[in-house]
Amino acid sequence: MELGVDPVQQQSTARTEYLSLGLAMAALRKVAVGSAGALGLATVGTAFVYRPNPWSNPPSDPLSERAGQEEESLLMKTSRLFTFVTGTAAFSILMHVLNTFELKEDEHYRKFLSLVKERPSGVPLLTVCNHCSPVDDPGVLVGMLPARVTMRPELMRWTICAQEICFKWTAAGTGFGSGKVMPIARGSGVDQRLLLNFYRRLLGGGWCHIFPEGHCEQGGSLGGRPAGVGRDEHGRLKWGVGKMIAHAPVTPVVIPLFHTGMANLVPINPLTRKILHALPRMGHTVTARAGRAISFDDLLEDHERRHGRLRKLSLPSKSCLPPTGDSGGGEGPPPGQFSFSSSSSVVIPGGGEGDVLWRSTREERQLYSRIARRVEEALLQLEAEARRDLGQSYPGYPAESAALLATHGRGGGGP
């Protein structure tokens, strides 16, 4: 011990320093917790403010209306990051731990993965997939893609969900919206504004992922329009996919995806269309595969040869927008507007006038049908490959669903 140093005073000084350090750490913890809480509230609030609102009149989606014109705010990006990280964690457990996921990693899958990760700027990607259960998205994509991709919102897909399912409640709409899910009105046709809002995301060079059957089909076969209810004339699939492809100034790369087994995770009552269990099932096998990119050049060229040039829809470039704070007067369409660029460019403004110009002609609808049939052929080819590869293990209706069908004399159980 040093001479001249009072031990009691030394201990008192040490206690004071320790107490001060403890108080400082407690204050820092409170600041950290408060900051995290404030950030959380801010991100949730941002997601709430910018959520798609299909129930407004007219339907509103402010972020989609400005797609390609401005960057999303940091808070909105943070909200999306939180949603995709937590979603990836939860569905990775469901697909890879509680169930078995088998992926066919061939050249078509590797092409699909490369397009998701490093697609040339401005080139849109459109994936079309069969629909077996309410958790196909994000379940199948989380199973197919590495976590380093699914945790990056800027790389991930935009998709659509029926407004009466995903956007019925404000809280649900806020969550789905931050997860890059957009509303669609089933049965409202290809000219609805909600499809137009979704289409803007494709025009900006984004990745759009859709289920063109329009509903879940759990029997093992590609669904869509029932046999005898317009299927022979119009095909199985919805025509929205055809419209999105037909009018794009840069034809999107279209990749078909096909999966089996998801119906066993979330069985649906085939008579009432209600989910049979509140939580997904475990102990099942899910398979997934990607197909060859689909070409539509011959269909587009044939249409233009017979009916003239197709209208090509494009978003305004940032250089066409008036400077920040300008009320207008700059060259090009104001924010929220875009144009069909063809031999005679047609500007599509917002509001009712834009809805009128968005309407399709009879000849264009015929083209949409032909494109949708081409997509149908690709998905049926993948289904045939899956049946051949899986043989007797190819899944049909879930056991509970098959039992309900059998009880009501409608058969079922096999694909």
Residue ranges of each PLM-predicted region?
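Cytosol/nucleoplasm-facing, intrinsically disordered, low-complexity tails
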Residues: 2-8
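Membrane-anchoring hydrophobic helices of lipid-metabolizing enzymes
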Residues: 4, 15-146, 152-155, 163, ...
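A conditional alpha-helix N-cap/helix-loop micro-motif detector
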Residues: 105-106, 188-192, 234-238, 361
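Generic beta-sheet signal
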Residues: 121-129, 205-214, 252
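Short acidic (Asp/Glu) patches
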Residues: 143, 188-196, 200, 239, ...
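A cross-family acyltransferase "interaction/gating" segment
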Residues: 170-174, 206-207, 218-362
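Short, highly charged C-terminal tails/helix-capping segments
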Residues: 388-411
